[in-house]
Amino acid sequence: MKRHYDSEETRRIIAEKAAQLFSQKGFAGTSISDISKASGFSKGHVYYHFENKEKLFVYLALDGMRAWGEKWAGVSPNYKTARDKLYAMSTFVMNNYQTPLLKVGQELAANPATSPETVQQLYGLAVTPMQAYSDIFQYGIDTGEFEIDDLQGTTFLFGTLLGALCQHIYTMEHGQLHGLFRKSVDLFLSGILKR
Amino acid sequence: MKRHYDSEETRRIIAEKAAQLFSQKGFAGTSISDISKASGFSKGHVYYHFENKEKLFVYLALDGMRAWGEKWAGVSPNYKTARDKLYAMSTFVMNNYQTPLLKVGQELAANPATSPETVQQLYGLAVTPMQAYSDIFQYGIDTGEFEIDDLQGTTFLFGTLLGALCQHIYTMEHGQLHGLFRKSVDLFLSGILKR
DNA sequence: ATGACTTTAGAACGATCGTTCTGTAAATAA
DNA sequence: TTATTTACAGAACGATCGTTCTAAAGTCAT
């Protein structure tokens, strides 16, 4: 069944621009009008493809995170040591920033006006990256590279730091930011205590 | 010269509630109406004390950060080693969270509609805490406790992590969050590599 | 008590918000 | 070709936004 309409493409463009705007300006700070202008389609047409603003964001976040997880699963086997995986992850997070959407998800979830089912879905968002981080740390324990007493806490802090660094993607020079991503892994690995 | 008017008090109440709301819901997500309801004063009255929403936020951020800096300067001498200072700082940041306002400041500064002078002022916000962190690390180097090749980067990452942890103040249980603050210092100090 | 000034509430404004409705040109099916 | 469905634009809606205006009540000096 061939389609000559190219509605899917339009939907993709709207989704892409919306994700960008949400990442930069937050949920409340991004209007449908903004999305309309950035995508080049009318405001009314955004509603042809997406039920409302909240559902649009949830779709973006869920789909983005799913794609993120799949992409990481694809490249992860290329790195053999836990140490390498950790450095690779830091670069991966920087170049495939779904994490701003995580923060925006927190913003939405914190708003009392947000529907409970949406909040529920948003809380599940962080599971994908956290699981990926946790897997690396566990792998490092198994290979004897790492010594970690509190896996969950370590995972959480690592994710928190990487996520926070992503906030600077739109404002900081790429090379400098990349250095900071590397350095956070360095710090996690070795600390600063004199030995 | 005694004053029987107590306008200063209402101004303080409005400022306090506004800071709380901005921290929780962000700049765009907080309306003057919200602030009016939370403080118990009319919407118009908010404008009697503050010129507009933007100026209100800038005042809150600047004043809050100034108070934060003074308070830390007051307690800092109680801790003798750099290590102790670092742990003390993590607790201090958690209990005197001005850092959510830092994030909201980023949100405001990222918005093209924000006036340039406001953006300028907001960029200066992070200087106070960063200087405080940097002082601790430098102190640790001087006492021989720490070995740090990139002071600025280390400072930035430490501030980033603490700031990000503050985001969970309204959603996470206090004791658990406190554990994470402690643990981030642990990690910065020692890392996870097996020795 | 009177008049000046400060502090407050509340109505009102235009702009913009998220959303819905209406109309229409293009694509497909008959 | 005609009828139906799909893909869009754009006007319009009520609600809420940040902000301003009006006016009354409270406080103070005289």
Regions found by a protein language model. Give the residues of each.
Chain A
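C-terminal peripheral helix-coil segments that are non-catalytic and often amphipathic
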Residues: 1, 91-92, 131-143, 159-160, ...
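Basic, helix-initiating cap at the start of DNA-binding domains
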Residues: 1-25, 30-41, 55
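Short hydrophobic/aromatic patch on the recognition helix
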Residues: 39-50
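Hydrophobic alpha-helical connector segments
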Residues: 59, 63, 70-99, 154-158
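Amphipathic alpha-helical packing segments from all-alpha helical-bundle domains
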Residues: 66-69, 73, 99, 116-143, ...
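Amphipathic alpha-helical segments used for helix-helix packing
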Residues: 96-117, 170-171
